[in-house]
Amino acid sequence: MSEKEGKRKSKTVEKVSPKEIADRIKKTADSIATQINKQEDPEFITMQRGKSNVVWDEKKGYLGLGEKEITRTFLNIAHARKFMQTSMIMAKTREYLEHNKTASIREIYYELKHTVADTKENTFEGQDESDPIIVDLEHSVDTIREKLNLHANPKGTLYGDITLLDRMHHNDKFNAAKLGRGGWSIMSRVEPEEIEIVDSNAEYLLVCETEAIFERLIEEGYPKANKCILIGTGGQAARGARRLIHRVHNELDLPTIVFTDGDPYGWYIYSVIKQGSMALAAHSEFMSVPDAKYVGMTIDDVKEYKLEAVTERMSEGDIKRAKEMMAYPWFQNKEWQSQLQKALDQKIRIEQQALANKRLDFVATHYLPEKIRNKNFLP
């Protein structure tokens, strides 16, 4: 396949303008104002969060939020403070959207924190009060935090033949394979309105749990030799990394393969990328990749690659997590039930970097190419 024939053009998806989000906030605020003008007790309605309202959508292949709602009323003394805080955050996020400004969730907390006039009452006592209000607003106006022009600390790195356009910074156009070995640091906000995915010559996306393996694969020339895009998550994938994984998979129509440590923590990292998380179940549609496949590490790899001497014992936390995962509906298939049971029976875990026991380049020259070529995946 020639480079020209192999180039994948991005499809524009999930693009919602800041004006549309600002209008949704205004509509909610107008509804509250109308109730006040009618001398009614104003209400703010959002979705109930928590495990009891998380549902597994087997047909779509990801976690979602149920239909349980909570109603916050101003005249309820238990709700009044949160109602005030919600109104402040609604006004401030709409201001950000209208003036094309972004803020971290820490910055909006400080911007809105003050003592109410003629009282000793602070608007917010800590960020642990403002963060949940932001989530409430996300659910109320049916969007994600990033589209409210809010962001948290970024984490994750992108490398490979993929061209991006940064609309928020002079329309800079760059290829992530030409930024040095360090690649591109994934921002916490990678929405289509800001970061456009232009095109790519890659044939698949490989997501790595550890930065050490991410760097090893780059050093060995794996992305170029195997025509893939790499994303290193540095542990559990941050929101920005999950959003970018979702976008690359869908907009470039690329297979997504995940590579983590062979333990319950690594397997859960995979499940969050694939099916979403309970904490962000409302946003799985924009962050999950139900078609993702898992390449390793697995307990079966220990025998297959003669790694018995470099396994580690599972901790009590690992054992507890494995038992919990066996009960999750999205792990109810024979492949994962078998893998989890083997881990519990043998009480071992195997890290990605244990492959260095064979030799440093083994992961890049043998392990990944062979397993991917043979489609030796877990679902």
Enumerate the language-model features and the residues they cover.
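Nucleic-acid enzyme cleavage-core boundary/entry regions
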Residues: M1-P255, P264-P379
